[in-house]
Amino acid sequence: MPSVQIRSSPSHSQPAMTVTDLKQRVIACLNRLSDRDTLALAAAELDSIALNLSPETFSLFINCLQSTDSSAKSPVRKHCVSLLSVLSRSHGDSLAPHLSKMVSTVLRRLRDPDSSVRAACVAASVDMTTNITGQPFSILFGPMIETVIHDCDPNAQISAAMCLAAAVDAADEPDVEQLQKALPKIGKLLKSEGFKAKAELLGAIGTVIGAVGGRNSEKAVLDWLLPNVSEFLSSDDWRARKAAAEAMARVAMVEEELAPLYKKTCLGILESRRFDKVKLVRETMNRTLGLWKQLEGDSTEVSESSSSSKSASSGLSATSGKRSNTLKGKDRNLNTPLSSKSNDVEPLDRGDTPKDVEQEAVVSKEKRNRSTLGAKRVLFPAKMHKVKENGSNKSQVVQSSDEESPKTDSGSSSSSQAKSNAEELSLIRHQITQIEKQQSSLLDLFQKFMESSHNGMQSLERRVRGLETSFSVISTDLLVSRSITQNGNHKRNACRQN
């Protein structure tokens, strides 16, 4: 019986000892993270502990991570958040009862000034969203929205907006109603001077628009959203310009019914900003511009096609008017030249009179004067050649046809001039693009040169410090050896004197 009691008593006390040992082990590993020499071993041990936890020890482990002081070193703060990702990936929905505590642990690190800690918060938000699906999405989404809206710390604003965008983008089935309610709230922050993380907020807005996916969208939301977002296309911050272009691209992709209503305005804005000086922004602008051009219902294209059809129809009516006088034109500008043509041609059929000859001379003189124009030579070279070679009757007929359609000639010359202007603009744009590519390559080379020179300076400084250290050690050794030899000499001299 005593042996049974001895065996049974440790079995009852084993779980308590295991929990105590686990807590001490975790705290010891967290302390070892502060030392650069033991950082890798401590991180590996903590990852192993997180992988092998039981559901009874989840709360204890998360409490140890949450109790880490903000004054700890950056590797400690970063790895505490990274362990939440390890837990989420390895245990999944078993952590659903502890999700709110994990979210609060992430929220405590949003104010961290270290960007690596904020990046770990974003990764943890994604892992919790994708792997812990047993709880509503609002447990993670709600606190992030509140932090974005109410927190005045710039680091917290940046981190919360990034976590919000990453979580919404990673969620399989986000709560669309909550996203629609939150969109006007976070959209108002674009006009707030107290909110500094405008680029990250624009990214979050674009992600929310993509998650809603055009479901139950309201025109009133886009009426204020698109103008506010498009204002940041001319921002001084290139990240804000890029995020604004991405948000407008999301609108073009998901809002198939409402986006065409804003196509003309958005195309004009994007066309004016497509030649950005930053390569990433320029590429994003061009992609967004292509998406908006693919939308249907552009009033600009309709007006252009209608105007071109009108000009073509006017040209056809003028040509038919030359061949037949039976056409009843609808344009008043074409009726007058047709009547003048009939009046000029009838006397020629009956016989030339002196008055008609004078009119013919005046007409042919005007024709010769107008033939010297550059636009006329370019547009109608064959006709002018025929007029010069043929007789006076042919020149009269050509002159009457020219008088029939002065607007057709001017329209043709203006269209030719517009075409040449378009070709010149395309050539200028091509040259500007080449110059921008050369500038970007030069900037890349300059950055690489600066990085290499910086690395060289750092290595040189390390070598100089090493030389100084070795020199100080050598000088110290020399002083010690000299003092020893001097003391030995004094002792020898004293012994000799005695």
UniProtKB/Swiss-Prot annotation:
Is the Ion transport keyword given for this protein?
no
Q: Which UniProt keywords apply?
A: Phosphoprotein, Repeat
- Region: Disordered, residue numbers: 296-423
Q: Name one Pfam family in it.
A: TOR1L1_N
Residue spans of biased composition, Basic and acidic residues class: 343-366
For this chain, one GO molecular function annotation is: microtubule binding
Membrane-crossing segments per the record? none
Q: Any keyword Phosphoprotein?
A: yes
Q: Where are the HEAT repeats?
A: 56-93, 97-134, 136-173, 177-214, 219-257
Q: Name one GO cellular component term.
A: microtubule
The Polar residues compositionally biased stretches are 390-400
Phosphoserine, modified sites: 426
Q: Which SUPFAM superfamilies match?
A: ARM repeat
Any S-S bridges, and between which cysteines?
A: none
- Stretches of Low complexity bias are at 300-322
Checking PANTHER family in the record gives:
MICROTUBULE-ASSOCIATED PROTEIN TORTIFOLIA1 (PTHR31355), TORTIFOLIA1-LIKE PROTEIN 5 (PTHR31355:SF19)
Would you tell me the protein name for this molecule? Answer: TORTIFOLIA1-like protein 5
- Gene of this entry: TOR1L5
